């Protein structure tokens, strides 16, 4: 019997404005999650989906010993989930609108994952935002807002 493929899935990140106790008595803090449809799409008797936690050295808890190295060695491939737009700063631009700041924490985390998996010779697949991140990781650029930046498109 062969072992199933172990496919890493990048975490989507929920950043609350500040940690608060919600009505259910649960502290709302930074959360990592996997979109259910992605899990359903990946999972089969031959594939185990493994969410890779985001490691950020700029977080509230300072841990300089955390690393994503082991995931690229242990897993057979990587899927980058969709979600919010990339932070324009990630591809060398300032946001055209204050609401378009993106998620620089997730960008750094996923760019690190891409680098590690590519160096390990492992396949990487991007879903929506993940495709945009792969484009930027390999030197590409993005339009922040196609209707205002490319009205003829």
Identify the residue ranges that each predicted region occupies:
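N-terminal beta1-alpha1 cap of cysteine-dependent amidohydrolase-like domains
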Residues: 1-123, 136-138, 143, 147-153
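Glycine-rich beta-to-alpha active-site loop
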Residues: 126, 131
